[in-house]
Regions:
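Sec-dependent bacterial lipoprotein signal peptides
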Residues: 1-18
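Non-catalytic interaction/Regulatory regions outside core domains
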Residues: 10, 20, 25, 32, ...
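Detector for small/aliphatic-rich hydrophobic stretches
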Residues: 15, 20-199
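Non-catalytic, conformational "gating/processing" segments within enzyme and secreted inhibitor domains
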Residues: 104, 109-114, 142-310, 333-420
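Feature captures eukaryotic membrane-trafficking machinery centered on endolysosomal pathways
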Residues: 106-130, 293, 421-453
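Short Gly/aromatic-enriched secondary-structure transition segments
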Residues: 133-137, 252-261, 313-323
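Composition- and surface-driven signal marking solvent-exposed, interaction-prone regions
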Residues: 251-254, 307, 315-321, 411-412, ...
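Internal alpha/beta scaffold segment
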Residues: 307-337
Length: 453
């Protein structure tokens, strides 16, 4: 029998581009013993199909019928109880600085993806190991965590062909061991998790895991996925992914792009800036930063946070004021004003690949990493000592003139500033800055630091 070693790897990828789709269903591969079930969503109607090429007329009545079906499908998917995620704001505000600090230079993470992975981890643990996870996630008990995670998943899943926010999870089990079916069923029902079983740590199972990760993240983290493997001692793996793509509500014009200098920590460099003017767009400020947001077609926002001169993104994260505003009080704060904002934003494509063991332990999740205290009896009732060995998180974020693409996956394997001017401001992101992509429910899908676009 294998030693009870747990390896946890978290990887996240986030890009800003256009268009993404979930792969078509296929027959379960060898080793897959449970298939995920995803909600059916009506596709967004293609306007071009309702134009008569001969007359040039638009069939508005037919389009309205299809549009109404799509809209009803969206509302049914997103209709979650008011305040379902209120208790998560503290977790996100506290954890994002730790997650980003794990990277040097450019940094990116998917807080939502990490939340889903930790919620799944709570399902397979017990005792104090589980309690520490629930305390960090501000969950009163497992029932409350399950209810909240279910709402979070459904509120953010979208596969309508216009905007994509595809969430996927999987559970990987060692063959020959006895597992309690209850947490496996909970992961399938609430987290839409596929289940695989085989000889973990062999080339065959490593290849299946990498194929699954690449498929769910649309190949956006292929280089990072190539480094994922399970130790022969691994007896359990959890994997969680997110693939997100959306267009700007108002796209940037490529003709307005300019070449300019970005003042990176390691020296100035020429980059391409995308430029636009927000007429009376909201501008926010705090004691050490200024911020604007760009709307996306799905109701999400990309927040751009520029530290004051002499301040760094790490300073802004440490103060917590910007995260408090973005994840909480941005709509009510007095530190906002409608201005004409001349925005210059560098195009970027950044990647992170880090270990989060220390970050999670600093948040208070410690017992699962210790073979002497880790409790995985919820899933492995008769098992010997087992522990969480490694937590790896990789993320990628890219933006262009059209919009945002983001993807993430988590694998757990067991074995200012002064008040702005009156009317107009130049918001030029030509030095290191922060960004957050928040959903329509104001949960952080992705966060990052751009030091060298």
């Amino acid at each position: 029998m294998k030693p009870r070693r747990l390896l946890c790897a978290m990887l996240a990828l986030c890009l800003l581009l256009c268009g993404c789709g979930q792969a078509a269903p296929v027959d379960p591969p060898a080793g897959q013993i449970g298939e995920p079930h995803y909600p059916e969503m009506a596709p967004y109607p293609n306007e071009t199909l309702f134009f008569n090429e001969n007359s040039g007329e638009f069939d508005g009545d037919s389009f309205s019928l299809v549009y109404d079906d799509w809209r009803e499908s969206q509302q049914n998917q997103y209709n979650q109880p008011e305040g379902y995620a209120d208790s998560l704001s503290g977790f996100f505000r506290e954890s994002i600085p730790d997650f980003l600090a794990a990277s040097e230079g450019n940094a990116a993470c998917s807080p939502l993806n990490i939340y889903m992975a930790l919620a799944m981890l709570a399902e397979v643990t017990g005792g104090t190991s589980r309690q520490q996870i629930m305390t960090v996630l501000n969950a009163a008990d497992l029932t409350a965590l399950r209810t909240q995670a279910d709402h979070v998943w459904n509120a953010h899943y979208c596969a309508d062909g216009a905007t994509s926010c595809l969430l996927a999870n999987s559970l990987w089990l060692e063959e020959g061991l006895t597992y309690d079916p209850n947490p496996i069923q909970a992961l399938a029902n609430l987290y839409h998790a596929a289940t695989f079983q085989g000889d973990l740590g062999t080339p065959e199972l490593d290849g299946m895991l990498r194929d699954w990760l690449n498929e769910q993240t649309d190949g956006l983290l292929e280089d990072q996925v190539n480094g994922v493997s399970m130790d022969p001692q691994t007896i359990l793996a959890l994997a969680s992914t997110i693939c997100y793509r959306a267009k700007w509500s108002t796209e940037f014009s490529e003709q307005a792009n300019t070449q300019g200098v970005f003042h990176a920590p390691d020296g100035d460099r020429q980059v391409t800036f995308m430029n636009t003017v927000q007429t009376y767009g909201p501008y926010w400020w705090g004691s050490d930063f200024g911020a604007v947001s760009l709307r996306l077609e799905d109701g999400s926002r990309m927040w751009l946070v520029l530290p004051d001169a002499g301040k760094t993104p790490a300073d802004v994260l440490a103060s917590g004021e910007a995260l408090e505003l973005i994840l909480g009080s941005w709509a009510e704060t007095e530190n906002q004003k409608a201005l004409m904002v001349n925005l210059s934003l560098p195009k970027f494509d950044i990647v992170s690949d880090v270990m989060l063991n220390q970050s999670l332990q600093s948040l208070g999740i410690t017992e699962v990493f210790d073979a002497g205290t880790a409790d995985f009896t919820a899933l492995i009732p008769q098992g010997g000592p087992c522990w969480l060995d490694t937590v790896q998180h990789a993320a990628r974020v890219a933006i262009d003139e059209e919009g945002v693409t983001a993807a993430a996956y988590t694998v757990m394997m067991t074995c200012g500033a002064a008040r702005p001017p009156e009317d107009e401001i130049d918001f030029i992101l030509d030095r290191p800055f922060l960004f957050l992509i928040t959903s329509r429910d104001n949960l952080p899908l992705f966060a990052g630091v751009v030091e060298n676009p």
